[in-house]
Regions:
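Phosphate/ATP-binding catalytic cores across multiple sugar-kinase/actin-like superfamilies
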Residues: 3, 115-127, 166-178, 304-334, ...
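Conserved phosphate-binding/catalytic loops in two-lobed NTP-binding clefts
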Residues: 156-164, 168, 347-373, 377
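Conserved phosphate-binding catalytic cores of ATP/NTP-utilizing and phosphoryl-transfer enzymes
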Residues: 1-5, 161-187, 323, 370-388, ...
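Gly/Thr-rich phosphate-binding beta-strand-loop-beta motif of the actin/hexokinase/Hsp70
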Residues: 2-27, 177-209, 336, 422-424, ...
Length: 848
């Protein structure tokens, strides 16, 4: 029977992957064809004969390939590369390329991921899979999601939906739990990523409340911590390693060789009190002695090294709970997902710091794939991609795929016109639950439409078979002939893990920042639509490609409106030029931006120009993350340390314990960078963590800006009072009193942004009051004259002539009108770049 539902769920993991499907109401993990394992190593190896090996056979090549590369470096000082690739999920959506020397070809991460997907597809022998639900970390960035979709396309999937991994795990867990209620935490610590998801069940409906995570935190970090803090110090103590360790490539290759043995020790110490790693055939040291790693690691020694990594994941989880006004004691349970969660160390830390009730009844290695398959069983394959057998009677079914009720309705419609085989006369149908414990009985389908009552087994996937009969009792083949209703759980839609915003110039703040689009706030249910009306800053001439509006789309953090662009993740840059517009668009025109995001977080963009009554629909171009430079990252670490020092010495409103904590984290980041400067993922992780520190530094600086802002606001109010007494009237007096009331409220809130907006209004009001006073304009002339050389006039001679004329008028026959005209013309002679520098603005950016 051709499938109408997707049915297949795939966990495309950093370290291991798995595939599952729903069969007769039960979730089945489809085992590998090389060892009958539930999971498949996410590893690709290509030999000299250009044959691809994926999974276990490829995994077995990692050690030999790494040792060969290290020896080539030791003997010849060259990088011979590797023909075995793993953990490439961490570089999805980046410009990272993996060179395969055996075939002289480079691969992007999505191309390697596609090979893993093809391998998983090959396990299914009874049909060809064309659709699947593929899971992704909740905190995956847009470029990573795009790369995952691309991998599915390269693997031959015609249709693919993406599902967040914590949701998939929750579905697998939730179906086995009776009377679910309250909050629980999904703690998904995988091989390469970490997600914390706060879930809640209300009346059987499960939804994501909030998420947090780190796309560069996982089992790989533990492996390298063991290498850097246990293995390499041990080798340095016994051998001379200067030649290898002083070279970035040599250090990188040695770490890669030792990683396998670190992983083995990690697994052993998950359950035992000690481990005895042994590795030989590592080449030679500087003195020609054979390198051999042989040591004993006790649990205390191990925990000292890896606890900070687990602690970071726990801190992220605690931050998530605090943000939602919850404590660990409020949780029903913690659901563990991912191989590293087998660790006795981690489980003990979780019980002590978050919640003692840890759920271990489901397999952390397969929970995501099983949940994805359950989810896939509720999702339709698009009708234009379904393969229908029109020789069978075609049916349309309407029913709830998931429910918390034990009785539901099925709507059944017979589509006689869609069947190539003629069907006449009455048609009867019987609906049979697959456990044979319930049947609808044979019921006539009157006027080709009927509603059936269904009785469901609780907390199970209920699979039903449809059988059609003609008036004589002959069976009529039909399609679809099966459907499934999952009882006991109803899953709300996935949510946005980030705010989605665009860069805008804020005239009140005098700078460009990233602002969230209304409707695309973090934790908004998908699909979602965000829109906002903004202003253009310059003229756009039709047909002119150089006249451009640039809209940068960003993923940004929680409550971070107005933050610097560099501190947010750029998704895409959309450019609208004069080539897209049919008529002239003047500056200060309205533009309505609309972003729509579907359940797989695919984005569509449109811009409406009311002045032209024109809508521009554009594809959101793909954006790849570039590799970060280790030296530049080190410079940023130094800059962050200097900023913290300045806060300690200069800031008035500062929590010194928080400063100390950030200083400690910077030291940790510096060590991380030093040990992994040759590793792509390590540098990405360093940049992500630096961003968080710089965001907090900016917030503290803004908080400390208030005393200065308050002084300036009070000065403006005093000036306004004086000007109003001298030039005002009853009407302006009321306006001034209103400003004073607003200023009191702003001061009470200590709101810097609103204060700056109010100050701009007061300045404008002051200008209105004094503009009729000739002394006001004379002061401008004197200021321009005294600071003439500091301005880069567009015409120095014209500016000089105007000032000389003004001084002549002032000394002989003062005229307010003439002086004002000269001042306004002088302002036009100030160059645009000088104005832009003053306001930190780019006129191709939209304005709030």
């Amino acid at each position: 029977m051709a499938r109408q539902k997707i049915d297949y769920g795939i966990d495309l993991g950093t370290t291991n992957s798995a595939i599952a499907r729903l069969e007769n109401g039960e979730i089945k993990i489809i085992k590998s064809n090389d060892g009958q394992m539930d999971t498949t190593p996410s590893v690709v190896h290509i030999n000299r004969a250009k044959t691809n090996f994926i999974g276990l056979k490829a995994f077995n090549q990692i050690d030999a390939d790494a040792k060969k590369a290290l020896k080539e470096f030791q003997n010849k000082g060259i990088d011979s590369g590797s023909n075995t690739f793993f953990e490439f999920k961490r570089t999805m959506g980046t410009d990272k390329k993996y060179l395969c020397p055996n075939i002289g070809k480079e691969f992007l991460s999505e191309e390697l991921s596609a090979e893993v997907l093809k391998k998983l597809k090959s396990y299914v022998l009874d049909e060809t899979i064309q659709s699947a639900v593929i899971t992704v970390p909740a905190k995956f960035r847009q470029n990573q999601l795009n790369a995952t979709q691309k991998a599915a396309e390269l693997a031959g999937f015609v249709y693919c939906e993406l599902l967040q991994e914590p949701i998939a795990a929750s579905i697998a867990y939730g179906l086995d739990v009776q009377n679910m209620k309250g909050f629980w935490l999904v703690f998904d610590f995988g091989g390469g990523t970490f997600d914390a998801a706060l879930m809640k069940v209300d009346d059987g409906i499960m939804k994501v409340v909030d998420t947090e995570g780190d796309n560069n935190l996982g089992g790989k970090n533990i492996d390298y911590a063991i290498v850097d803090h246990l293995f390499i110090p041990e080798l340095k103590q016994k051998f001379q390693l200067n030649n290898v360790m002083k070279n970035d490539l040599g250090q990188h290759l040695l770490r890669d060789v030792l990683k396998k043995y670190a992983e083995e020790a990690k697994i052993e110490l998950s359950l035992n009190e000690s481990a005895s790693p042994y590795a030989d055939d590592l080449g030679f040291d500087d003195g020609g002695n054979e390198l051999i790693l042989e040591m004993e690691i006790g649990i205390e020694q191990y925990e000292k090294v890896i606890s900070p990594i687990f602690q970071r994941a726990i801190d992220i989880s605690l931050k998530l709970l605090e943000r939602n006004n919850l404590q660990g004691s409020f949780l029903e349970t913690i659901l563990l997902v991912g191989g590293p969660t087998f660790s006795q160390t981690l489980r003990r830390m979780l019980k002590l710091q978050i919640c003692s009730n840890i759920e271990t009844s489901i397999d952390p290695m397969t929970a995501v794939a099983k949940g994805a398959a359950l989810f896939a069983a509720t999702k339709d394959i698009p009708p234009n991609q379904q393969k229908r057998d029109t020789a069978k009677v075609q049916l349309t079914l309407k029913y709830p795929e998931t429910t918390v009720e034990t009785e539901e309705k099925l709507g059944l419609l017979v589509n006689r016109n869609y069947s190539s085989k003629s069907v006449s006369g009455k048609i009867f149908a019987e609906i049979l639950r697959n456990d044979n414990a319930w049947s609808s009985g044979k019921i006539e389908i009157v006027d080709d439409a009927e509603i059936f009552s269904l009785l469901l087994n609780p907390s199970k996937s209920n699979c039903f078979t449809i059988t059609l009969f003609d008036e004589k009792g002959n069976m009529l083949p039909c399609e679809p002939s099966e459907f499934t209703v999952i009882q006991g759980l109803k899953v709300a839609n996935a949510t946005l893990p980030y705010n989605i915003g665009i860069d805008l110039f804020d005239p009140s703040m005098g700078k460009i920042g990233v602002y969230t689009l209304k409707g695309l706030e973090k934790n908004t249910s998908l699909p979602a639509k965000g829109k906002g009306i903004f202003k253009t800053q310059k003229d756009i001439r039709p047909g002119n490609r150089n006249d451009q509006l640039k809209i940068e789309i960003y993923e940004c953090g929680y409550k971070e409106d107005g933050s610097k662009k560099i501190l947010n993740e750029l998704i895409n840059l959309v450019i609208i030029s004069g080539e897209e517009l049919p008529q002239f668009l003047p500056a200060n025109s309205d533009i309505e931006i609309v972003l729509e995001i579907d359940t797989s977080r695919r984005i569509t963009f449109s811009a409406y120009f009311p002045y032209l009554d024109e809508t521009v629909d554009l594809e959101v171009p793909e954006q790849r993350q570039a590799e970060f430079n280790a030296d530049e990252l080190n410079t940023e670490i130094i800059r962050a340390k200097e900023s913290l020092f300045n806060l300690e010495t200069d800031a008035i409103l500062v929590d010194y314990s928080e400063i100390a904590k950030m200083e400690s984290e910077l030291s940790e980041i510096a060590i991380l960078l030093e040990n992994g400067k040759g590793d792509y993922n390590t540098k990405t992780q360093v940049m992500e963590r630096l961003r968080e520190i710089f965001k907090r530094i900016d917030q503290i600086n803004e908080e400390n800006e208030w005393p200065t802002i308050e002084d300036e606001l009070n000065w403006l109010l005093e000036r306004m009072k004086n000007n109003n007494q001298r030039y005002g009237n009853d009407k302006t007096k009321k306006q001034a009193e209103q400003f004073e009331l607003q200023a009191k409220e702003v001061s009470r809130q200590m709101n810097i942004k609103i204060a700056k907006e109010l100050m701009e209004q007061i300045r404008s009001f002051n200008f209105t009051l004094v503009r009729d006073d000739i002394g006001f304009w004379i002061n401008y002339i004197r200021d321009f004259d005294n600071n003439f050389s500091t301005h880069e006039w567009t015409s120095t001679s014209r500016a000089r002539t105007l000032l000389d004329d003004a001084k002549q008028i002032i000394s002989t026959n003062p005229s307010k009108m003439k002086i004002e005209e000269i001042v306004r013309e002088l302002f036009t002679l100030i160059p645009e770049k000088e104005k832009a520098a003053i306001s930190e603005n780019d006129d191709s950016t939209l304005m709030r």
